[in-house]
Amino acid sequence: KTLKVIRKADPDFKVSLAGNYHEEIEPDLYDYCIVIGQNFPEEVRLRRVAENKRTNYYTCCTEAHPNTFTFSDPAEAAWMSYYSSKKHLDGYLRWAYNSWPLEPLLDSRFRSWAGGDTYLVYPGARSCIRFERLIEGIQAHEKINILRQEFEKKGNKAGLKKIEKMLAPFNLGSMPEIPAAVTVNRANQILNSF
């Protein structure tokens, strides 16, 4: 019903949703972000690309790995963008940037939520390793996108295959047995060879 009201008011209004995958409303969503572990059907993902719609994923308190909690392996923040590249998605949604608890420099928890879930930077223009590693991952994701476009344009199948092989180890469920840092560092070495 809500989408009908929106379409009646403005047929071109772009609607976003971060939540579970719902086939019945997917065509009406310009920016659709589903929880990590769920997948867009491949034909839907490809159609969304052709329609220039944003297709992403997110994490929240329920995922132990990967995540950006203060106790998470900092490399998990970079890992998430590599995973997005593997899935051929537009990116990763981080729900909070600076929603600080009362004393963020002393205690990163907010109520029953995991420490650091509500912010990635600290007050007073202070960054943190989680944010810096997230930036690293975003930069890697963008480089992968540029390389894929270049390789496709030039018919460089070997380059495309090398990228896919580099991304193959980014699998949900591999952590913590295979630390994110191991997977990210290997991928960084390969990506930096281009």
Where are these regions (language model features)?
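Catalytic-core regions of glycoside hydrolase
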Residues: 1-105
